[in-house]
Amino acid sequence: YYPSICTTHGFADRVRNLKICREAGLEICSGGIVGQGESDEDIVDMFLALQELEAKALPINFLIPVEGTPFAAIKHRLTPLRCLKILALARLMHPAAEIRAAAGREYHLRSLQPMALFIVDSIFVNGYLTESGQGRDEALQMIDDLGFEIGIEYSRASTDGFACLVTA
């Protein structure tokens, strides 16, 4: 499915670059975006490819249809339950990796968003590339309401705006 989305480079180019990074001693943080018209098999293939790359962290993004972009009118099949299943599949296929719920989680998970925190290790807050995300205070309240604790202080976290979660 990758060639129908990315036209500037091939999937093999991406894999080669990630392997070079891993061989240089870098930990791989590589995930994907769902909701672009991919099949269930495409999602499984993505997670299988990430297994081969030994990704340490997998950010899972959910497409936010932005007006004026090629994906604005895409007919996605992302329901809150489907998004949870995708996150659960990531967890099952990558039990030792850090699974990160990234862009679009608020938009697609809606009222089921807190359930995702039982699957993932971290969430992105305060904005994404094209859209604003859930604010820090609202995310912290959700985390606290569930009885989780922040594993990394937000003010000391790296600039990519994620907070790691640790169960109480």
Question: For each predicted feature, which ranges?
Answer:
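Conserved non-cysteine loop/helix-boundary elements of the Radical SAM core domain that shape
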Residues: Y1-G25, I33-E54, P70-R82
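Active-site C-terminal subdomain of aminotransferase-like
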Residues: S30
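Auxiliary Fe-S-binding modules of radical SAM enzymes
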Residues: L48-A168
